[in-house]
Regions:
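GNAT-family acyltransferases
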Residues: 1-68, 85, 89, 123, ...
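Acyl-donor (CoA/ACP) binding surface of acyl/acetyltransferases
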Residues: 33-156, 231-309
C-alpha cells in the first residue's frame, strides 16, 4: 500500500508490464499484477499486486491508487475482491500485507477486511537510500471465514452488564483495530483507572463502567465519569467495541441505553471528547447529536449532547 506516483517512469512501468504478462495468474515465487480501471471508460485508476510464497500456500498483496481516486472506497472494494479470489483457491491459507506505520488509510483498508496487525519491524523497508519501519498485517483462512460470517449482522439484544469474575477474561481481551488505538485506551488501562482514580479539579473522579453484551457475547466496554462535586454532568470516558463486532450498530445502541439511563437519573447533559484525525469517532458522535462545545481538553475536542431536547 503505497501512493502511486503519477506520472510513473515509463521505463520502469514497461518492465513491470512485461514481467506480469509472462504469467496467466498468480504464480509461486513471482509478483503478478492487476489493473484497477474505470468500468465505463477503462481509465487507469490504480493497481493490485500478488506474490505467492510457501509453494502457493501464502499470498502477499499490495495495492496503490492514483491520488485523484483516493478516498472513494476503491482500495477497499478492489482489495476485498482480490482477497476473496485468493481464498477461493483452496491451497491458500494466509494472505498478508505490509505498509508504512503512518499510512493510516491503508491500514484501515486491511482492517476492514479482518486483517490482524501482527507487529512492526523497525527500519526494515528501504526505498533507494531511505529506510522506514514496516507494519505487518495477516489474515488466515479461518479468520476470513469467521469475519465474513459475522459481518453486518445486527444483534437482537444489547445490554450493559456489570463486570464480574465470570466475564472478566472476556472483557480484558477486547481489542480495537490497531489504527484505532490512538483514539481509545485498552480495557486494562480503564480498569486500572477505575481502581486508581484520576483527579479532576483536585477531586477523584467517580467511575461507572460496564461490559457491553450483545446476544450473550461480550463485545465491548463503556466507562463514564459520573456526576460528582467537580463533574456536573456525566462524561463518556471510554467507549470501545471489539474489532470483530464493529459495524453492527452496537455503539449506537450503547449510546441509546446510556441516554435513557441518564435521563431517568435526572441528568440534563452527556459530555465526551475525542481526538480528531483519520478514523476518528468524531463523525459517529456528531451523527448522534453531540455538538462541540468549543473546549479542547488535552488535545481532544469536547462535545455534549442535550438530554432535555
Amino acid at each position: 500500500m503505497a501512493e502511486l506516483v503519477v506520472p510513473y517512469p515509463l521505463e520502469k512501468a514497461q518492465k513491470i508490464v512485461d514481467s506480469v504478462m509472462e504469467f496467466d495468474g498468480p504464480t509461486p515465487g513471482e509478483w503478478w499484477g492487476l489493473v484497477i480501471a474505470d468500468p465505463t471508460t477503462h481509465a487507469f485508476m490504480g493497481n493490485l499486486a500478488v506474490h505467492l510464497a510457501d509453494h502457493g500456500h501464502s499470498a502477499e498483496i499490495g495495492y496503490a491508487l492514483c491520488v485523484q481516486h483516493r478516498g472513494k472506497g476503491l482500495a477497499s472494494d478492489a482489495t476485498e475482491a482480490l482477497v476473496n479470489a485468493l481464498f477461493a483457491r483452496p491451497e491458500i491459507n494466509r494472505v498478508e500485507g505490509s505498509l508504512h506505520p503512518g499510512n493510516i488509510a491503508s491500514a484501515m483498508v486491511l482492517e476492514r477486511l479482518g486483517f490482524v496487525h501482527e507487529g512492526t519491524s523497525r527500519q526494515s523497508y528501504w526505498v533507494e537510500d531511505v529506510v522506514s519501519d514496516d507494519a505487518h498485517y495477516g489474515l488466515l483462512r479461518e479468520e476470513w471465514s469467521a469475519w465474513n460470517d459475522g459481518a453486518a449482522t445486527r444483534p437482537t439484544v444489547v445490554e450493559l452488564a456489570e463486570i464480574t469474575e465470570r466475564n472478566l477474561d472476556d472483557v480484558t481481551t477486547l481489542a480495537t483495530h490497531h489504527s484505532q488505538r490512538r483514539f481509545v485506551a485498552p480495557v486494562y488501562r480503564s480498569l486500572a483507572q477505575a481502581l486508581i482514580k484520576p483527579l479532576h479539579k483536585g477531586e477523584p473522579v467517580v467511575p461507572w463502567y460496564r461490559a457491553i453484551v450483545a446476544d450473550d457475547t461480550v463485545v465491548g466496554f463503556v466507562m463514564l465519569s459520573d456526576v460528582s462535586p467537580t463533574e456536573p454532568h456525566p462524561y463518556v470516558w471510554r467507549l470501545l467495541i471489539d474489532r470483530a463486532h464493529q459495524r453492527r450498530g452496537i455503539a449506537s445502541k450503547v449510546l441509546e441505553l446510556l441516554v435513557a439511563d441518564r435521563i431517568a437519573k435526572g441528568d440534563t447533559k452527556l459530555v465526551l471528547s475525542y481526538m480528531p484525525g483519520l478514523g476518528s469517532p468524531e463523525a459517529f458522535y456528531r451523527k448522534h447529536g453531540f455538538i462541540p462545545t468549543g473546549q479542547i481538553d488535552d488535545g481532544e475536542i469536547e462535545a455534549s449532547l442535550d438530554l432535555k431536547s
